[in-house]
Amino acid sequence: MRAYLYDNLDTDCREPHEQNPSVPVSVEELEASGVLYWRLKDENFEDQIDKICADRNYKNRDQITVSKQGLGELFDAKIKTFFAEHLHEDEEIRAILEGTGYFDIRDKQDRWVRIKVEAGDLIVLPAGIYHRFTLDSNNYLKAMRLFKEDPVWTPLNRPCDEYPYRKAYLNVIEAN
Ligand SMILES: CSCCC(=O)/C(O)=C/O
Ligand SMILES: [Fe+2]
């Protein structure tokens, strides 16, 4: 995982969009926005996932393959939905199994921070954070999705500042 400020250029979102010079964003800075990160080791990948699930009460899991083959005729529509700035009522928890991609999150100053993920990364985006997702130029990512009960990942596109989970998110972040 590597995180940095987005350059805000209006070119293909699958490009890195790293500023020049780059402005790195640390794991601690991500945490200040409520984003959690773990690096999972190959040797005991499943054990580490199981421990995080037990600690954080994630009871269920499934897998998604974000690629033309994996999503079939839904691919173009899904990719568009993922990259529209949105939030969810629930956490978005993804353990990357194969491939690469970018999660962009809005930090406390409402700047886009780009998080490059690869196999072995586990990321938790808190409920209520504005974010988006895109593949990179490899056009392939397979992820495990973790969730507590039935997940509520309906994307609510910005602006939705009046939703209770957005307000709850801002309250937690401001107290940090
Ligand atoms: C890497 S999983 C696909 C992206 C997704 O599920 C989502 O909600 C993006 O915001
Ligand atoms: Fe999302």
Task: Specify the residue positions occupied by each region the protein language model found.
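A short beta-loop-beta micro-motif enriched in histidine and acidic residues
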Residues: I79-I93, D110-W112, V117-A119
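Surface loops and adjacent helix of pleckstrin homology
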Residues: R106-K108, G128, D136, L146
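Conserved metal-binding segment of the jelly-roll/cupin
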Residues: V117-S137
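Double-stranded beta-helix
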Residues: T134-N176
